[in-house]
Amino acid sequence: MNKKEEVLEGFAEVFNKRAWLDKVKMEKALAGYAASEVHCIEFIGKHKDPNVTKMAESMYMTRGAISKLTKKMLKKQYIESYQKADNKKEIYFKLTAEGKKVFEIHEQLHKEFENRDQAVFEPIKDEQYDAFLN
């Protein structure tokens, strides 16, 4: 196995272990919500004027899939749609009180997981992060 394959395999292993560690707590705290709904809520909660196109590009889904997902979420009252006065064509989304609740739970879980994993990342120096990112 060459170095590139070793690095990719290492990343995959870390990703899979984190997913496994996070899964039980995430499923318990967000029971009743589909993973796609939670990711959509996360995107809407973190971005200004999110629309179908922005969400599709970020979530690597088709616009059709996002449209279907947002319609379902509108019906469940996790999100609301709105339009700007200067652009009646484009539809944007914002979180309802229920959506904000899910967003906050999800963010808190990520902070807990980050704290849990802190010991793994402490020995890594900035130069090493830079090497991975460049």
Q: Where are the regions a protein language model picked out?
A:
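N-terminal helix-turn-helix DNA-binding core of bacterial DNA-binding proteins
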Residues: 21-64
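C-terminal regulatory/oligomerization modules of transcriptional regulators
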Residues: 1-2, 126-134
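N-terminal leader segment of winged-helix/HTH proteins
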Residues: 1-32
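Alpha-solenoid HEAT/Armadillo repeat architecture
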Residues: 1, 45, 60, 122-125
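Charged, amphipathic alpha-helical coiled-coil/dimerization segments
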Residues: 71-129
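A cross-family signal for key residues in well-ordered alpha-helices
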Residues: 42, 104, 133
